[in-house]
Amino acid sequence: MTTPWTVRPETPADVTGIRAVTVAAFPSQDEADLVEALRADANAWIDGLSYVAEVDGVVVGHALLTRCHVDGADALALAPCSVLPEYQRTGVGTATITALLGAARERGEGAVIILGHADYYPRFGFVPASRFGVTAGFDVPDEAFMAMPSTPGAPVPAGTVAYPPAFGV
């Protein structure tokens, strides 16, 4: 099946487009500011783990993995994920996240953590993080705080997630 979009790693030329997509996808600029703060944090940002979907050279979707830790063990935080409203429910988000998770797997990364919609993220293999003994360190609904190994069957470390400072938690 041919799609009108292509998915690829972010380049410096995408920064403005990523901000525009993120602002359009959320009710405030907070998530767009989060992306920029994470990009500026050398301890959180991982080159090659920020992916965009584009149509005719225009960024229409974005997904980001940054470094976090579970009781000191390296892990990844998936957030934020953004799609222009007119491209939502078309497969852009799924394609972008799938490619991004594949890139993490190819790099040999470990666990991936997400605080997100319980009806959406299980399609990628996410399950409640509590099944692995992973906690957020703040109150979140169990079904919305999820984890998965980037490589199926690999261990997920138990403990409390330490997010980069930009997350504010």
What are these regions (language model features)?
Residues M1-A37, A44-V59, F145, T151-V169:
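Short amphipathic alpha-helix that is part of the acyltransferase structural core
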Residues E36-D41, F132-T135:
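Short, solvent-exposed loop/turn elements at beta->coil junctions and helix N-caps
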Residues V52, V58-C68, D74-S82:
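Conserved beta-strand in the GNAT
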Residues V83, R89-G102, I114:
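Conserved acetyl-CoA-binding loop-helix of GNAT-fold acetyltransferases
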Residues R89-T90, T94, V140-T151:
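Accessory recognition modules or surfaces
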Residues E106-G110, L115-P141:
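Conserved active-site alpha-helix within GNAT-family acetyltransferase domains
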